[in-house]
């Protein structure tokens, strides 16, 4: 087992990474301050892991709420199911919520914890690669709105993150590839040596080599923890973690939540950001080629859906958390391992990128 720490002063917390951690009560008990625990999970994960986690938390009074599975259920209505379960069971402010599932479960559970009785503790137990390397770390929580993804939410840090890499054994191939998109992102935004490693080891990751996956998870969490420690509430540098997300969220929203997986949208969004960076003269041709090639090798889409026109892209991108004072800020690349957040770009480069949708350029 390996442990990292997200350094946030008196709100610092550990990230435990290893095999069999779902069965290890010592990873959980020290971070639970009350006697009652509500596990929040979904219909897919519950049959696989809920009973195991209940046994591990046997020293506490444990209840569970099982939600429907899918991005299309990341809504206020689903969030209300969690509130109802907590209220009906008379949970108080000493409650601890445990998110057992992927990114949707983590985001909903975290937002419920941030808002129930004005804030209770929660623990992240991510079971997908995407949630293990990205959404479980950093305290972003929330739900979607029909007009925009993740537009309703709060920053609320977990008490700890417990990553049992054995849960990846039950992860569908498409979900694994979607998670690899977020892994590639770290190489692109701040860790060129990691990008080099990914080029050399992509086949091992796709084959689910345990050592390669463990290394990729640890390195990704390390990179994210450093960025979050520098800028917890995304006032500056943390926004680089959104590489590909403005384009990607537009794809997810425009196609209907759940049609494209989040990681698939991010993958295509990163390619679009790289192409725009090349148009601006910031990214050289070789780095663009390497970016496109690695994402394609991971089995991820590199072209946006032709159903979303340039005009529709622009409309969807205007509803984005990175819009400030009416100005769209984008995360772009000056090289592999060097991302920038900027509103200072030639709009013609963005227009050209959006108008190339479907052309492969």
From Swiss-Prot:
InterPro entries: Dehydroquinate_synthase, DHQ_synth_AroB, DHQ_synth_fam, DHQS/DOIS_N, DHQS_C. Keywords: Amino-acid biosynthesis, Aromatic amino acid biosynthesis, Cobalt, Cytoplasm, Lyase, Metal-binding, NAD, Nucleotide-binding, Zinc. It comes from the Bacteria. Zn(2+) binds at residues 182, 245, 262. NAD(+) binds at residues 69-74, 103-107, 127-128, 140, 149, 167-170. It catalyses: 7-phospho-2-dehydro-3-deoxy-D-arabino-heptonate = 3-dehydroquinate + phosphate. Its EC number is 4.2.3.4. Binds 1 divalent metal cation per subunit. Can use either Co(2+) or Zn(2+). Pathway: Metabolic intermediate biosynthesis; chorismate biosynthesis; chorismate from D-erythrose 4-phosphate and phosphoenolpyruvate: step 2/7. Its cofactor is Co(2+); Zn(2+); NAD(+). It is found in: Cytoplasm. Belongs to the sugar phosphate cyclases superfamily. Dehydroquinate synthase family. HAMAP family: DHQ_synthase. This is 3-dehydroquinate synthase. The lineage of its organism: Bacteria, Pseudomonadati, Pseudomonadota, Gammaproteobacteria, Chromatiales.
